[in-house]
Each structure stands twice: as C-alpha cells, then as structure tokens.
Amino acid sequence: MNPKFSVLFLVEAADFLDGLDEKSRRKVIYNIDKSRYVNDPKLFKKLTNEIWEFRTKYQKNQYRLFAFWDKRDKRETLVVSTHGMIKKTGKVPKPEIEKAKKIMEDYFDDDGE
C-alpha cells in the first residue's frame, strides 16, 4: 500500500523531536508514519481549515506536531510539520495554532508563492 502523503519536518519540528527521549521519539515517528497510510483522527486531526496535528499519547504525555498541506506538486502530496509541543491542557492552545499558521505563511512566501 502506498502512503497518502510524505512528511517534511521544518527546523522547529525536527528540534522538538530531537529533544524527546528515544522511546517517545520512536513512538511519535511511528504514529506519524502510520498516519500516512490510515485515516485515523487519533493520529492526524484537522484543527482549523489549514492547520492539522499529528497526535501521539505515550506514557501519560500527549505529543502534538502541528502541520499543513502543500499540494503544489502534482506528483507528491506533502504534509509540512511546523513545530511540536507536549500538550498539558484539554484544548490545543490558540497561540500554538497561530504559530503554525505564521510558519505556514512564511513557508509559502519564501517559496515565491
């Protein structure tokens, strides 16, 4: 079975993953990879019209990596991960969603779009 999309980790997302302990990082990456093949909102969920989140619950922590779609390449659909956080509240904090939107805007602006 072919994946539905590829994932690009921007610097802040990669730094977030690098800062996790080995087992947590493996679980987060496993879930991200799994979400490429299955449609499961427990793993990959839409937050707003543009912003999505990769979701992992592991050892009582809730890990979130924010992302958006880049469908400009007709051959490959790309999901771009902006940054991550360990969620401690019931709802995703609005500043995190706003940060993801700003990074998305910069991403497309830097590409000349």
Where are these regions (language model features)?
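Basic, Lys/Arg-enriched alpha-helical interface segments
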Residues: 1-62, 71-79, 85-113
